[in-house]
Amino acid sequence: MNALFFKLTLAIYFAATIAYLAYLVKPREVLGKVSCWILSAGFVAHCAYTVDRYLEAGHTPITNLHESLSFFSLAVVGIYILFERKYRIFILGSFVTPVAFLLMAASTGFPSAIMPLNPALKSKWLMVHTVMAFLSYAAFSVAFGAAIMYLIQQHFLKSKKLGPMYQKLPSLDILDEINYRCLTIGFPLLTFAIISGAIWAESAWGTYWSWDPKETWSLITWFVYAALLHGRLTTGWRGKKAAILAIVGFFVLLFTFLGVNLFLSGLHSYK
Amino acid sequence: MNIVVVGLSHKTASVDIREKVAFAPTQMEKPLRALLAIEDIAEAVIVSTCNRVEVYISTRDIAGGMARIKRFLADYHGISPEILEPHLYAHHGEAAIRHVFRVASSLDSMVVGEPQILGQIKTAYGYAAEFKTSGIILNRFLHKAFSVAKRVRTETKIASSAVSVSFAAVELARKIFGNLSDKTVMLIGAGEMCELAAKHFINNGVRGVMVTNRTYERAVKLAEEFEGKPVSFDDLFDQLHKADIVLSSTGATQFIIKPKDVEEVIRRRKLKPMFFIDIAVPRDIDPKVNDVENVYLYDMDDLQGVVASNLQQRAEEAKKAEAIIDEEIGQFHKWLSNLEVTPTIVALRSKFEETRKAELEKTLASWKDLPPDGAKRLEALTTAIVNKLLHPPTATLKRVGQGGRTDLYVDALRTLFELQTGESEAEELGELEE
């Protein structure tokens, strides 16, 4: 059952990615709506997979890389669908959906067997900490997509070479606003994830903070986004600067999530 | 029945001729009725815009119909036919259908893709419908033209980009700011181009206008016109940060706005984007201003470059539009031909059926020792003979109906079999087909 839901999700995300890329080539309203419906169907299947796995394992399924990548992808799609409902910019999906699909596809590269939980992970904080963290990651991923679109569109406007792509991309103003929105959603979630992680660490290991590589990199990520938010609110950083920082932030975040797990050893490294 | 189009446009006649031939849009009843009074003209629609005057009719007599419209146009406007004739084009059949589809889709317009023409044809059709000078053929024809134009509009990007400098500027502003309703325009100098561009921005929802000029009185006057705020030229850099869009067209011989000024202004705006449009020649704004973060500068050449690339894009989209029209012509032509062929088939069949029935009745009445099922058998026999005989001509007519040269066959059949040539059947049929 579980494997079926997984395969179904992967297949639908693949279809949605193709549909959104087709929309990028031929931006017809109908195609955009169809893409969104496909993606929504994938989201439902993905939720089913996650819930099913939760019931089977008896804990939130974010305890190994396979599960984390899958959950990351689920959060990206969920947050994206919210933005889609609000802004109706299907083209954003052309940039975000492939990310979700790739995360999902990457998860197939890691063992998916449900393993008994390590005692430290047996806690109510598992859900709070990890879900918050991944929702914030998802918001920053959407910001990443919008930032790339911003830089492309800005390049067209500055260079005055207005190709067909220029017509398809939304206005700079909207892209900047999405970037900001993502930040205001993602940053509090990340902050909360770090705080809840610290509380959990205290109850599991007796110390709030132990400078484990994951913790260190989380803090770095937090600082990058804090700087961006601060810059936006006080000195009015916007546009290109904000877009570049959103992209930098996303890569730091990716390293925090993947790099630390794969290359550095620590309490967060899943085996 | 044929469709005939006679007219002239910006492509065939200069404005002084077009003016003379134009019909006053509010007084269409008289010319429409006059057209319908002419012999052999069954239906008529007149399209009259500043770029074209066209008469659409349905008639049985193509050559006669063309000649009669030409004479009508000359007589009605009191122009000698010799002067008018060289400017007129006349189409019938498929060419007429193609022509009107192209006109409605704005492929024949001065600016390809401009949307006004469709509305103008709709208005023209509205008059014809009001005065009942259009009937089943032109009704169907024009409705088809409207739907073709709509298809062209939705399936191609023929009208999706701005093709004038002012509109290009508005379009660019939309790509930078999104919504323009909370944006402010600053006019520097009071040139005509600047005014025009400012009007486009106001029509597109820009909220505030500020005007500055070396002569302050001129700024005050122009500001009044736009219900804006005059700014003294000396205060320009004190006020510039309040503007999102800056339109400049002074007669200055040197740059009046330099990167340093703009950097300062943009800092005061907390990096909120600015869009500078330099319409002046020589230019007012240093091109290096474009390098300042969140500042976009377009001069006249840049804008014209945008327009040129948009026009090129339209030309490419026009090719797709022509393909759509090709497809639709076939469909409409088929309908028109069937309209012609079907009543003839119906008439032919009923003629045969009447003859068969009459003869059968005569025979039955005089046949004394008819076997019990004789009447039934004779009925079946005669029906079978009639059907067998009628099958080849019916099939042939349906086939030619889809190809062309319909008139020839239809006329021959009608003459040979003395069929009724009334309009009423065609009309009934047409209504059924609607």
Curated annotation (Swiss-Prot), chain B:
GO molecular function: glutamyl-tRNA reductase activity; NADP binding
Keywords: NADP, Oxidoreductase, Porphyrin biosynthesis
Name this polypeptide is given: Glutamyl-tRNA reductase
Family per similarity comment: Belongs to the glutamyl-tRNA reductase family.
Catalytic activity: (S)-4-amino-5-oxopentanoate + tRNA(Glu) + NADP(+) = L-glutamyl-tRNA(Glu) + NADPH + H(+)
SUPFAM superfamilies found in the cross-reference section: Glutamyl tRNA-reductase catalytic, N-terminal domain (SSF69742), Glutamyl tRNA-reductase dimerization domain (SSF69075), NAD(P)-binding Rossmann-fold domains (SSF51735)
Note: During catalysis, the active site Cys acts as a nucleophile attacking the alpha-carbonyl group of tRNA-bound glutamate with the formation of a thioester intermediate between enzyme and glutamate, and the concomitant release of tRNA(Glu). The thioester intermediate is finally reduced by direct hydride transfer from NADPH, to form the product GSA.
Chain residues that bind NADP(+): 189-194
Binding sites annotated in the UniProt record for substrate: 49-52, 109, 114-116, 120
Enzyme category, top tier: oxidoreductase
Taxonomic classification: Bacteria, Pseudomonadati, Thermodesulfobacteriota, Desulfuromonadia, Geobacterales
Annotated GO biological process: protoporphyrinogen IX biosynthetic process from glutamate
Domain of life: Bacteria
Site (Important for activity): 99
Subunit-level organization: Homodimer.
Catalytic residue positions: 50
InterPro entries reported for this sequence: 4pyrrol_synth_GluRdtase (IPR000343), 4pyrrol_synth_GluRdtase_dimer (IPR015896), 4pyrrol_synth_GluRdtase_N (IPR015895), GluRdtase_CS (IPR018214), GluRdtase_dimer_dom_sf (IPR036453), GluRdtase_N_sf (IPR036343), NAD(P)-bd_dom_sf (IPR036291), Shikm_DH/Glu-tRNA_Rdtase (IPR006151)
CDD domains on file: NAD_bind_Glutamyl_tRNA_reduct
Job description of the protein: Catalyzes the NADPH-dependent reduction of glutamyl-tRNA(Glu) to glutamate 1-semialdehyde (GSA).
EC number: 1.2.1.70
Domain free text: Possesses an unusual extended V-shaped dimeric structure with each monomer consisting of three distinct domains arranged along a curved 'spinal' alpha-helix. The N-terminal catalytic domain specifically recognizes the glutamate moiety of the substrate. The second domain is the NADPH-binding domain, and the third C-terminal domain is responsible for dimerization.
